[in-house]
Amino acid sequence: MTETSYIMAIDQGTTSSRAIIFDKHGKHIGSSQKEFTQYFPKEGWVEHDANEIWNSVQSVIAGAFIESGIKPVQVAGIGITNQRETTIIWDKKTGKPIYHAIVWQSRQSADIANGLKEAGHEELFHKKTGLIVDSYFSATKIRWILDHVEGAQERAERGELLFGTIDTWLLWKLTDGDAHYTDYSNASRTMLYNIHELKWDEEILKILNIPASMLPEVKSNSEVYGVTKGFHFFGSEVPISGMAGDQQAALFGQMAFEPGMIKNTYGTGSFIVMNTGEKPHISKNNMLTTIGYGINGKVYYALEGSIFVAGSSIQWLRDGLKMLERASDSEEVALQSRSQDEVYVVPAFVGLGAPYWDQEARGAMFGLTRGTTKEDIVKATLQGIAYQVRDVVSTMKEDTGIDMSVLKVDGGAANNEYLMQFQADILNIPIQRAGDLETTALGAAFLAGLAVGFWKDLEELKESYEPGKIFQTQMQEERREELYAGWKKAVNATRAFK
């Protein structure tokens, strides 16, 4: 590996695709981003055009090379990280998708999920996959496409169709159809993968009538899956050597390599993931059990709590209530509040995620008086994000018995100093902000680089990690518990109002 070698991370997200080029020290030297179309055919449905996603990825690869000034031949390996659960089915010979990609947020297969519950399959799915039965995951989306595209079931049974999440689709396209693989982390989000036996589950496939021939082979998160075909990568054959779903990539990028290490990504929603080590913890409290990552012949499991609304509640203050000009203004406005924290905002705009999993709940405000100001509402909205994180972290502690010493954070809202300080106060543990908030792409780059010897081992990765600011608890215990008790009352009242 020469001094002039680099690693490229492709970060394929829900609204945009990005490519970032990293050097040996984990610093990005060039990047490019491109948004793509969101399709909403019916209420609750969300779809993407898989070919448009592929075109956007090709565009950002070129853009990253232009910005960095490096040549494709200098790329030692490519890591892919992706929006998870989003489902694509395509023709094996032509490479043409038979339907739009059904996005993780989409509820169009909810009836299939409800049918599985009514048939009494919930416990079986939970034990084998670690997941709750929900249309969030890929399994019901596959079944929906096979049911609604004419002839699809028969074609799948004849071995003519392939399924993949976004990682698999991009790998297949980059290798010109040579590689049909996925990784442990993405497989564990399909609701088809047995996380104990590390294989596609025959009983589940039979229940859903999904032919096994459609499914990609599952590999580790750090190995060479194939090489780019020259015409897709400007004349170079570069190994694709790392893959992970976005939240697991962020866990790896945050260096959460030991059991009990926990990270939270504050994005549109908030995703708290804890490394639980080499044995899965099946949650008794509605946390998702998933695979964190598999490297060097070992698989590390994780617990995940998904919060549906985090950063999007700040966007609501800006766009819906017109209380902010810019989302970043929320910190300054919150600090102007003179309230005693008696206002609570429960941002259940699309229901409540973990640990409640209440799709029917809707947002509410409590404690309003004639004296309540917009500053109070902005502050309470930020606090609502932090309270939800405590709900999840407390539940994880109850599930595992593990005391967390620090919460590692990243994502856009982690820049909000007021939110981070309140988060430390309400959790009573330090908050460590990442020095570089691009931890998702960095995790994919790390996985790719380890596989090709760009980095030697985890110890060398740790040397490149630069933590950002640490926020220490400043609140008294009595005050903390008083505030949190008020939040629990607000959530209970919200759930009662339907």
Swiss-Prot record:
ADP binds at T14, R18, T268, G311, G412, N416. The modification Phosphohistidine is found at H232. The keyword Glycoprotein does not apply. Glycerol binds at R84, E85, Y136, D246, Q247. Pathway: Polyol metabolism; glycerol degradation via glycerol kinase pathway; sn-glycerol 3-phosphate from glycerol: step 1/1. Its EC number is 2.7.1.30. One of its GO terms (biological process) is glycerol metabolic process. Keywords: ATP-binding, Glycerol metabolism, Kinase, Nucleotide-binding, Phosphoprotein, Transferase. Activated by phosphorylation and inhibited by fructose 1,6-bisphosphate (FBP). CDD domains: FGGY_EcGK_like. Sn-glycerol 3-phosphate binds at T14, R84, E85, Y136, D246. InterPro entries: ATPase_NBD, Carb_kinase_FGGY, Carb_kinase_FGGY_CS, FGGY_C, FGGY_N, Glycerol_kin. It catalyses: glycerol + ATP = sn-glycerol 3-phosphate + ADP + H(+). It comes from the Bacteria. One of its GO terms (molecular function) is ATP binding. GO terms for cellular component: cytosol. NCBIfam families: glycerol_kin, PRK00047.1. Belongs to the FGGY kinase family. Key enzyme in the regulation of glycerol uptake and metabolism. Catalyzes the phosphorylation of glycerol to yield sn-glycerol 3-phosphate. This is Glycerol kinase. It comes from Lactococcus lactis subsp. lactis (strain IL1403) (Streptococcus lactis). The gene is glpK.
